[in-house]
Amino acid sequence: MPKMKTNKAAAKRFKKTGSGQLKRDRAFGSHLFANKSTKAKRHLRKAALVSKGDQKRIEQMLTYL
């Protein structure tokens, strides 16, 4: 039986917290900042947690995380 492969695209985007939840960056935070308010840009700096519905599928891609 060959080894399972980690999905590298997912591995670059998610980190596992100490409690086992997955942490992710927020969307819409790479460019076009002139159109965003200061408050919106400040919220984009904070990481978010993956929702429970998505967590199981992402963990299947991150076999060894």
UniProtKB/Swiss-Prot annotation:
SUPFAM superfamilies: L35p-like. One of its GO terms (molecular function) is structural constituent of ribosome. GO terms for biological process: translation. Residues 1-27 are annotated as: Disordered. The keyword Ribonucleoprotein applies. GO terms for cellular component: cytosolic large ribosomal subunit. Keywords: Ribonucleoprotein, Ribosomal protein. The keyword Zinc-finger does not apply. Pfam families: Ribosomal_L35p. PANTHER family: 54S RIBOSOMAL PROTEIN BL35M (PTHR33343), LARGE RIBOSOMAL SUBUNIT PROTEIN BL35M (PTHR33343:SF1). Belongs to the bacterial ribosomal protein bL35 family. HAMAP family: Ribosomal_bL35 (MF_00514). This is Large ribosomal subunit protein bL35. The lineage of its organism: Bacteria, Bacillati, Bacillota, Bacilli, Bacillales.
